[in-house]
Amino acid sequence: MSKKRLHEIAKEIGKSSKEVVEHAKYLGLDVKSHASSVEEADAKKIISSFSKASKPDVTASQTVKPKEVAQPSVTVVKETGSEHVEKTQVSKPKSRNFKAEREARAKEQAARKQANGSSHRSQERRGGYRQPNNHQTNEQGDKRITHRSQGDTNDKRIERKASNVSPRHDNHQLVGDRNRSFAKENHKNGRFTNQKKQGRQEPQSKSPKIDFKARAAALKAEQNAEYSRQSETRFRAQQEAKRLAELARQEAKEAALKAQAEEMSHREAALKSIEEAETKLKSSNISAKSTADNRRKKQARPEKNRELTHHSQEGQKKNKKSWNSQNQVRNQKNSNWNKNKKTKKGKNVKNTNTAPKPVTERKFHELPKEFEYTEGMTVAEIAKRIKREPAEIVKKLFMMGVMATQNQSLDGDTIELLMVDYGIEAKAKVEVDDADIERFFEDENYLNPENIVERAPVVTIMGHVDHGKTTLLDTLRNSRVATGEAGGITQHIGAYQIEEAGKKITFLDTPGHAAFTSMRARGASVTDITILIVAADDGVMPQTIEAINHSKAAGVPIIVAINKIDKPGANPERVIAELAEYGIISTAWGGECEFVEISAKFNKNIDELLETVLLVAEVEELKADPTVRAIGTVIEARLDKGKGAIATLLVQQGTLHVQDPIVVGNTFGRVRAMVNDLGRRVKSAEPSTPVSITGLNETPMAGDHFAVYADEKAARAAGEERSKRALLKQRQNTQRVSLDNLFDTLKAGEIKTVNVIIKADVQGSVEALAASLVKIEVEGVRVNVVHSAVGAINESDVTLAEASNAVIIGFNVRPTPQARQQADTDDVEIRLHSIIYKVIEEVEEAMKGKLDPVYQEKILGEAIIRETFKVSKVGTIGGFMVINGKVTRDSSVRVIRDSVVIFDGKLASLKHYKDDVKEVGNAQEGGLMIENFNDLKVDDTIEAYIMEEIVRK
């Protein structure tokens, strides 16, 4: 049902909004202003009431046509004595809405009660249910008044009415019963009699006229009075709130002024105390300085002045006697006065006639010329160092704008400014980090130039796979270890020392495979000379170029050994030309690199190669100091089951002894035993000597530096500190999610991982294998090295593999019987290898198997929505026609509107006429519903598609 606002009703009937609002309130409607809304029935009621109020009064003589109301058929009989006159029977009206009428009358009666009082309301209620409108008269009302005027009793009239009521309208009869009972009660109580006695007029044949203007004016006056009372109450409340707020502000202001005054008094007291301390300090400094000057003058006085002083003192003795007598009399008087003052009413008073203690003069300390400070020194520490009072320094800092206490730490800049104010040169103290062993390799000032001697050169042999590096080293050592290498590849770095022409040469053998790039780089960092071995029949290969780059980066000279010249296809000139392209130019061509043609297999020109090495070493002037504590580099490290951690070290400076406390990388320990390259125990190792040691608490990393410390306590502290720093650095390197890398992190979450555990015989192989596996590039899959270590595969590795769903890869190691049994029980896979590129190929195949299938979108067809049908509790059904291809039940669909995709989802149903079908072909019509989408519109395009799997190549 629609609603109307009061100002619209006022405009419609030509009245002011104010009058309409007051009239609506009078009718009992809940309105507040001209913007209030009322129901359409209430609006009609307001309009009709205005129209009735505007009609002229109808006199008693005028005949007014009664308003047709829905009443039952009633025959009214007028009685005059014994005479019965029958009036015209009222025609049967239409059915009435009694409930609405009752509600309207109730509202009207409430308004009348408020305006005229309860007595008039009772009179209106006696008008009965049959009056549809109190502003009009009806024939039935006239009859009731006639009955009362003729003196009929109320009981007879009620009985007559009851006999004429039609039994068809039960509700009407009930209302009549209520009216009759109300009339009887009034008659018994004598209310009608009282009304007549009080001179009230009998009700007329028509309803009394209501003066709406008077009632509205009275209501408005009452509202104005109520509003004035409320306004006065609000005004008083506001005045009281303002008064309380003003009091609160005054109290807060007084408290602030009081606090400010206290703060100013404290500040003045502090400044006064500082000034007093400063004046005392100045006076003490002046007195101390004058005392010192007088002392120096007395000491510098010659003997003649001393004699004159002696004579003058003898001449003054006579005058002193008279002064002494006067002083004795004065002292006697003072003593008598003190005696009289001591005794008070028999009380014992302590004797205070003791001599005052002499005041010790404060010593004057000169400021130092230099001040060495550390970050975070306190004011008290600085005052103690420069021999000044902390209060003085606090005051200076206060004048500089720095608020500090004597226990507060100061930064370096503040300390320097303070020293400038005192005129002292400030220097920051350089703290030596005992845990930093890298400083020994960067700064050689700790070496003694008098003890520096010539040392053996460290030579690294580099080259491509199977170009003869190990064969050359085997020939140099007269050993055949090269034949035992799997696949023709050296598995770890070895260090060997030979003697030629009374001089020693240390050789490092680096692997030739690309996987050992980091190991070769580590070898180049400790070497003095590089022997680049190139096969005469193969020429320059990729690993040869890498070896050249590592040697150039290390800044070491290169000696080229062209091997396999005994083969029929050997072409040394081609090798020389190819190396020239990479900056390795022979001395025969005007370059700086020495070229030697050899045959490692047949021991040809090996002596010439060694002589070339010694010649280059002599040119390089390799020196070392064997008297200092030893430092060097870890060549290789491994874990032995019986001996523990074993590290192969190359001593670079100093001499390493057994029982030396040592720090190796992030580990520490004491050298228990030392073994040289021949397997013999030695007690010391000089510079350029490779040895294997035991006694470390953990296995170090290949390439770590080592240093010998003064005692085991210092070594332990340095090792633990380095371990903590390494752990902290590892945590800091952990990538955290930020706005910049958030997308990459989310993308990485979709990548599959292959977890592996690596166990190898030596540390270098572990690092090389882990680096090679991580570099394998398979889109969508990566290798995650869960754990890598040196040693055999044990039960802990199997347990870790089971927990992390990893594969164990053993390189040149075997599992223990217990580990193999546990792996069979827990279904853990163990792969054993001795050739590195076999491991890489196997892991790459496993990574490809981890990939999810790749899908490609295939368009099936298109359809146009011709009509839409909305079904309650079901959704929107789209009637469509296929214009291209087909639409299948299991396909996905896109809803395209104005060339923009607005939804992408699955079909909920597909029908052809009334039948469920699996597909609808081209030029056919059907109906469809889309899951979770009901916003289909005519002319929308439906694109059907499926995702097909693509076979990986």
Swiss-Prot record:
The keyword Protein transport does not apply. Residues 488-492 are annotated as: G2. Residues 454-623 form the tr-type G domain. Gene3D superfamilies: 1.10.10.2480, P-loop containing nucleotide triphosphate hydrolases, Translation factors, Translation initiation factor IF- 2, domain 3. Residues 80-89, 98-111, 140-188, 229-240, 300-317 have a biased composition (Basic and acidic residues). Residues 563-566 are annotated as: G4. GTP binds at residues 463-470, 509-513, 563-566. Belongs to the TRAFAC class translation factor GTPase superfamily. Classic translation factor GTPase family. IF-2 subfamily. This is Translation initiation factor IF-2. It comes from Streptococcus pyogenes serotype M1.
